[in-house]
Amino acid sequence: VKAGVLYLAAGANVFAIDGRTGETVWRWQPDSAEAGMVPSWQGVGLGEDLVFVGLRSAQVAALRQDTGELVWVESVGSVPQQAGGQVTTAPIHAVGKVFVGVANGDSGGQGRVVALDAATGDIAWTFFVVPRPGEFGHDTWPQDSDVWQVGGGGVWLVGTVDPDLGMVYFATGNPVPMFGGEIRAGDNLFTASVLALDMDTGDRRWHYQVVRHDIWDADIATPLLLYEAEIDGEPRKALAAMRADGLLFLFDRETGTPLTQIE
């Protein structure tokens, strides 16, 4: 909501609704059915007088807040795009960038977090959830196969940002195949994890994997929560993450240090 206008995604449309009268100010629909918003509950992001929305075609679009006119659209999928890649999170706007997650459902692919320039749509950086050869964590996947290329880790929950710390936080999904752990030996980083990334560069600041080698689809099930806490008389910037089985994890969001004992 901004200046009394509600902005929302519904089916294959983005609406601007007058909050006082309920009248439609404008409606925008992509050119093709394949590009429709997914899913309707993901919502939109606002910033710099633009409305940002994710598309089924693994694209992000920016619309003018006042008219709904398309300003830019940019692909955040792989090249060539992997089947099923979608932007399933509401875009987040902060410090001149738009942050989104990309997921392929449970069909594999490579989950990722992408940052785009809010004004132009140019991609600033991409962080792949499953590390590539030579990257930290790649050794947590089988070294004698290419299963990592379809290892999953879809980013399907909206993230959150702390501009003061310069970090953006996302939860990642389960590895793929979901229950076929025998073909993906290892911890399978950075699936089923909390990721803290540098907002400017996309570099990993810290991570915590809530399930190693997940074979239960027990990844994080709710958006991450940032909050302020007092521990031993000292103020702490904290983060809460809840796993699908209801276990709650609490972290110092600056360092990733657990605030409660984890066994």
Regions found by a protein language model. Name each.
Residues T89-T120, H213-E263:
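Repeat-solenoid scaffold signature
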Residues N13, Q59, G105-G108, P175-M178, ...:
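Short glycine/acidic-enriched loop and turn motifs that connect beta-strands
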Residues D18-T21, R64-T67, D117-T120, M199-T201, ...:
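Short loop/turn segments that connect beta-strands within beta-propeller blades
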Residues A9-D31, G186, G202:
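Beta-propeller domains
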Residues L8, V53, V100-G101, F170, ...:
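Residue position within the beta-strands of beta-propeller blades
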Residues V1, R27-E48, L70-A90, S107, ...:
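Extracytoplasmic beta-rich repeat domains
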Residues A3-V5, E48-D49, V95-K97, D164-G166, ...:
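Short coil/turn segments that connect the beta-strands within blades of beta-propeller domains
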